């Protein structure tokens, strides 16, 4: 949200359902003093309360945590103004077929992970839920270079979630995650 301030938007509204993250942002913004940045204790499930409201929605690291990802994409589409843009970041599994993994309980030790699609599957989800001009603009394997332990983050991290013998697999034996970015538009 702070990076968006550079573009001088009229309003940036962050949905943050976790109270510790909500207050962390509030404290940081009290120092930054950026009046156009706001957050509310809301989640993506509250988007139906905002019909035709947003010019841009950033959905970052959320879609695979939703038990009904297609409903979530439809709710976002309804919350976008005509011509509005969705910027979506997600974990995916590698592959050229339009399929999604439905893990038994956890994926890379993360509970609450429902569906991990391939890039073609995610593209189809976007198209079939009504988005236009769907474009994938980045895809790469995840690695410990982007998610790792540090003196500030001492808990388990990426290297603990991946099979020690075969880095192409998660600890559960599923394909290891990749990261993908899509841009899509409401007609």
Feature roles, as predicted:
Residues 55-69:
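A short SAM/SAH-binding and catalytic strip from SAM-dependent methyltransferases
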Residues 113-136:
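Short alpha-helix
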Residues 45-57:
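A short acidic, Gly/Pro-enriched loop at the edge of an enzyme's catalytic core
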Residues 1-9:
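Conserved SAM-binding loop of SAM-dependent methyltransferases across substrates and taxa
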Residues 70-85, 92:
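A short glycine-rich, Lys/Arg-flanked "PGG" loop and its adjoining helix->strand segment in the class I
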Residues 138-187:
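A C-terminal cap/extension of S-adenosyl-L-methionine-dependent methyltransferases
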Residues 32-46:
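Conserved SAM-binding strand-loop segment of SAM-dependent methyltransferases
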Residues 91-113:
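Short, glycine-/aromatic-enriched active-site segment of Class I SAM-dependent methyltransferases
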């Amino acid at each position: 949200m702070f990076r968006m301030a550079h573009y001088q938007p009229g309003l940036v509204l962050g949905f943050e359902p976790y109270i510790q993250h909500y207050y962390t942002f509030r404290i940081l913004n009290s120092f930054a003093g950026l009046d156009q940045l706001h957050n509310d204790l809301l989640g993506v499930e509250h988007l139906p309360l905002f019909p035709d409201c947003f010019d841009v929605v950033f959905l970052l690291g959320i879609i695979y945590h939703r038990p009904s990802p297609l409903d979530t994409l439809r709710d976002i589409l309804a919350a976008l103004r005509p011509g509005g843009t969705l910027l979506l970041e997600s974990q995916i599994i590698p592959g050229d077929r339009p399929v999604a993994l439905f893990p038994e309980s956890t994926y890379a030790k993360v509970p609450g992970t429902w569906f991990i699609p391939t890039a073609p599957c995610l593209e189809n989800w976007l198209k079939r839920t009504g988005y236009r001009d769907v474009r994938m603009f980045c895809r790469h394997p995840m690695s410990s270079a982007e998610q790792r332990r540090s003196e500030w983050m001492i808990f388990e991290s990426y290297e603990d979630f991946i099979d020690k013998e075969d880095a192409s697999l998660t600890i559960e034996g599923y394909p290891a995650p990749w990261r993908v970015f899509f841009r899509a538009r409401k007609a």
